[in-house]
Amino acid sequence: MTVLSGTGVLGHAYISMCLLRLRPQDLPASSTLLLLSAVVYTVTNFVVLIIDVALPEALVLALAVTVVVVAVVNAMLALVRNRQRANQTLSALFGTSVILFVPGYPLLVWMNALREAGQRSNLAETLWLLLFVWSLFIMAHIFRNALSTRLIGGFFAALALDAIIMVASYAVRDWVGAVGA
């Protein structure tokens, strides 16, 4: 039985996944769910990005990050011959990221306001670090299940995905800057 059958609620499923209680395979392997979670993930990335970059650049970056996540996850799953888990894995990654947006966005706005005022807050920085570490645990949990590996393998997969997203984001920002110049 899937989480969405009966009276289950999708938001509750993603929160439970953030608490490491559910696995990606507990979600339905639904293309509709994947599309919905990818769209919401892209929109939340866009909202985060417009804090620091111009609107067109934020849109391109948000779309690029989503494409990178899809490509990298599909490549990882292909390496372990588990491509059938793609929809659930991607839905889990996108959905849990959206859940983390809820505490992350106000924290990001606070840190941005402090930076613009030339100030720092150890509390804000510590909370941001804790949120990042927790997001790695969530991603590691998702990858551990999707790749049928140990938690440490999930951590390496999570770190690899984050590193690839970072490199791709810088490359896209450079490209957008060159096109806009």
Task: Locate predicted features.
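Short secondary-structure boundary micro-motifs
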Residues: M1-T2, G8-L10, Q119, W128-L130
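Short, strongly hydrophobic alpha-helical membrane anchors
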Residues: M1-V3, G180-A181
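Selected alpha-helical membrane-embedding segments in polytopic membrane proteins
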Residues: T2-S91, G95-S97
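Membrane interfacial helix motifs at helix-loop boundaries and amphipathic/re-entrant anchors
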Residues: L49-L59, R115-R120, R173-V176
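Transmembrane alpha-helix boundary/anchor motif
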Residues: V67-A75, F137-I138, V167, A171
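Hydrophobic alpha-helical transmembrane segments and adjacent short intramembrane/lumenal linkers
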Residues: N82-G154, A158, I164, A168
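Juxtamembrane boundary at the C-terminal end of a transmembrane helix
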Residues: V167-A181
